[in-house]
Amino acid sequence: MTKLVNEMILVLDFGSQYNQLITRRIREFGVYSELHPHTLTAEEIKEMNPKGIILSGGPNSVYDEGSFRCDEKIFELDIPVLGICYGMQLMTHYLGGKVEAASQREYGKANIQIQGTPDLFKDLPEEQVVWMSHGDLVVEVPEGFTVDATSHHCPNSAMSKADKNWYGVQFHPEVRHSEYGNDLLKNFVFGVCDCEGKWSMENFIEIEMQKIRETVGDKQVLCALSGGVDSSVVAALIHKAIGDQLTCIFVDHGLLRKGEAEGVMKTFSEGFNMNVIKVDAKDRFLNKLKGVSDPEQKRKIIGNEFIYVFDDEADKLKGIDYLAQGTLYTDIIESGTATAQTIKSHHNVGGLPEDMQFELIEPLNTLFKDEVRALGTELGLPDDIVWRQPFPGPGLGIRVLGEVTEEKLEIVRESDAILREEVANHGLERDIWQYFTVLPDIRSVGVMGDARTYDYTIGIRAVTSIDGMTSDWARIPWDVLEVISTRIVNEVKHINRVVYDITSKPPATIEWE
């Protein structure tokens, strides 16, 4: 934490998949927030000087052996504390109340009734719908606490000890299903913690530029530039901070979209006057991927090769100490932490070799995708970069399901170009968060002309989202889908069938691999 942040809400991570949403909601209020491991000591927290502490939810019972705990001394810091779900139970356990397994687990929407006029529920309706997700519950609040809300299955749905600024809720206010959840969090952040709400992307730029300068000093930085939103914003931010100390390397690994390699060089080398070195490594990557079909193995191979390519280039350049990456908050969350399950490894996180020669700089690793776009705009990047489609580091390597071959890459490349062209032609670019084609390792029978065919199927994936943590399938008009399907079947060799993915996230991820 740098001194440029004069107010911050600290969220301690106990393993809930909702944790990042707490941080996100608070930032939406214009207050800076960070998610940190539950293992932080009270002394470390004191040095960070947060305006408030939130104990997140989690999958454990407070009585489980090895369950996640925090330093009890945080309750001696004279800092407001809000416990959410497991966080409320842990607070109760530490402060002398009683937690038990519920006779009936409660998952989903529930109606709560507010009692009195507690601070967290100021100016909110006496009855409201909230999102519950718990197996244990508080059966006896700690001494000096009042019960602020009840529900049919959870008599102690919320509690507080106002003179200490300690609060607990058994439900999840950060989830949209809690209809007044944002208002409750605002009451804690502004009413209890007395935050002002002056944090913005402009502040973030100043904070990160100071961090970069302090970290790098007079040393050199190598940036992994792909031309996507994340790496472009990283390059612009670091270039703004340290200028010519930054060298960008653009690796053409043969897994890019149609026309992408040429576009990247033109935009950054010519348009932004950055030092960009292009490396043609297609054969190197494809040879490594030969015979590999497991998606996790492909991701790690691609991640490793990226680092080794940078190693080779750094040896040529001499004196490179740092590697900059466009790792986002969602990358870290989905790759798992000590308290969260791994969903999939990200090339910016799980694929890094242990013997890499660089120290990492990841200035976006506390931001969500929409915040990165806002940052790009603040940095003066053009709209065609800021609103460019999200594109995974492994590229088309994970949009070809199974083994990657040049023939399959060309199929995905051409079909994806048609999809992007028609989405643009029909003015849908800003309505759809991400859209692309995938090539499952599936062949099916078809008829083209008078001949029987046995060719590949192309899948179209298009989703709406805000930050990529959750998404819904995009309702592209049927007539537009018909145009796209017809063009793909007629213009892309070895395709005789097109399908549309109508699965949300969860249960599916946005990418198929």
Curated annotation (Swiss-Prot):
The record lists ATP as bound by: S226, G227, G228, V229, D230, S231, S232
Q: Name one GO molecular function term.
A: ATP binding
Q: What class of enzyme is it?
A: ligase
Domain GMPS ATP-PPase positions: 199-388
| ATP-binding listed as a keyword | yes
What would be one Pfam family of this protein? GATase
Q: Which CDD domains match?
A: GATase1_GMP_Synthase, GMP_synthase_C
Q: Which domain of life is it from?
A: Bacteria
Q: Where is the active site?
A: C85, H172, E174
Q: Which UniProt keywords apply?
A: ATP-binding, Glutamine amidotransferase, GMP biosynthesis, Ligase, Nucleotide-binding, Purine biosynthesis
Coiled coil spans: none
Q: Which InterPro entries match?
A: Class_I_gatase-like (IPR029062), GATASE (IPR017926), GMP_synth_C (IPR001674), GMP_synth_GATase (IPR004739), GMP_synthase (IPR022955), GMPS_ATP_PPase_dom (IPR025777), NAD/GMP_synthase (IPR022310), Rossmann-like_a/b/a_fold (IPR014729)
- Could you tell me what reaction this enzyme catalyses? XMP + L-glutamine + ATP + H2O = GMP + L-glutamate + AMP + diphosphate + 2 H(+)
Instruction: Give the pathway.
Output: Purine metabolism; GMP biosynthesis; GMP from XMP (L-Gln route): step 1/1
The enzyme's E.C. designation = 6.3.5.2
Q: Which GO terms describe its cellular component?
A: cytosol
Residues covered by the Glutamine amidotransferase type-1 domain: 8-198
Q: Does the keyword Kinase apply?
A: no
Q: Could you give the subunit structure recorded for this chain?
A: Homodimer.
NCBIfam families given in the database record: guaA_Cterm (TIGR00884), guaA_Nterm (TIGR00888), PRK00074.1 (NF000848)
What the protein does comes down to: Catalyzes the synthesis of GMP from XMP.
This chain belongs to which protein, by name? GMP synthase [glutamine-hydrolyzing]
Organism this protein belongs to = Bacillus velezensis (strain DSM 23117 / BGSC 10A6 / LMG 26770 / FZB42)
